[in-house]
Amino acid sequence: MAGPLGKDLLGLAPLSAEQIRLVLDTAIPFREISERAIKKVPTLRGATIVNLFFEASTRTRISFEFAEKRLSADTVNVAVAGSSVSKGETLVDTARNLEAMKIDMVVIRHPASGAARFLAERIESNVINAGDGTNEHPTQGLLDMLTLRDRLGDLAGKRICIVGDVLHSRVARSNIWGLKKLGAEVAVCGPRSLLPNAIGEMGVTVFDRVEAAIEWADALNILRLQLERMQAGYIPSLREYNRVFGVTSARLEHASRDLLILHPGPMNRGVEIDSDVADGPHSVILDQVTNGVAVRMAVLYLLAGGKPELADAAQKGVA
């Protein structure tokens, strides 16, 4: 029987505000586990989870693995470069072979938009999207919202601006969908060449100057330039990008209120963000990393059929 999130977590666009709040609320008791000397509860003991990453990842893959192990699940990491995929095996054949070994969940990252949904429609195991092309990265969006909610309280009416390479960013799309469902005002800022043509249809404000975005916002979520997805011509140079759109301490003087600084990583210091901002008093970047494990524990728990009202008991290792 499907849990409160359904069978899979493929994106934030299909979720209701109530489902998003459910994940954020469920993550809070799980966050305490990471503060303990013994960082493990038996909640998913006996479950087998496969991490199937077709793209390079450090934070997301490790965060999922920590979340799985802290819930006592058996974790299998498939190195695609050394698997049968490198010999021409299809995504579905790989997953079906894994499912024949009686797994329970698949966490997938893939360069093709829609890959997670394609897989979820063809296997019975739960599927969690850890990033598919430029489509969505739902757990990153959720952890960003938890980090914002920790500091700002109810996000309704709060102003969040996403700065940088929105065109190639699945993080931006998940944040836009999720934040708007929670009633936040969302804006984007970046070179027009790095903003989707139809960005206005998502109901966001567009800023051409980062100074104006800083003056408007309660928080900035700063994105790196995804050079690996670009052909030549999107920006004149990295130096020019930093000069015009880089978030610096001098630019933060334009803020009309205390401003939170988020970044999903990896950071390119000196390009989209300067070190004194990344490491400064307004930065909650490391809080995002901490919250990432808790949010992913909550998602795993809920997809496995865990009852939200028992999350506190699960956190104590008795449910």
UniProtKB/Swiss-Prot annotation:
Keywords: Pyrimidine biosynthesis, Transferase. The keyword Transferase applies. SUPFAM superfamilies: Aspartate/ornithine carbamoyltransferase. One of its GO terms (molecular function) is amino acid binding. Pfam families: OTCace, OTCace_N. It catalyses: carbamoyl phosphate + L-aspartate = N-carbamoyl-L-aspartate + phosphate + H(+). One of its GO terms (biological process) is amino acid metabolic process. Carbamoyl phosphate binds at residues 59-60, 109, 137, 140, 265-266. L-aspartate binds at residues 87, 170, 224. Its EC number is 2.1.3.2. Pathway: Pyrimidine metabolism; UMP biosynthesis via de novo pathway; (S)-dihydroorotate from bicarbonate: step 2/3. GO terms for cellular component: cytosol. It is an enzyme of class 2 (transferase). Heterododecamer (2C3:3R2) of six catalytic PyrB chains organized as two trimers (C3), and six regulatory PyrI chains organized as three dimers (R2). Catalyzes the condensation of carbamoyl phosphate and aspartate to form carbamoyl aspartate and inorganic phosphate, the committed step in the de novo pyrimidine nucleotide biosynthesis pathway. HAMAP family: Asp_carb_tr. Belongs to the aspartate/ornithine carbamoyltransferase superfamily. ATCase family. This is Aspartate carbamoyltransferase catalytic subunit. The lineage of its organism: Bacteria, Pseudomonadati, Gemmatimonadota, Gemmatimonadia, Gemmatimonadales.
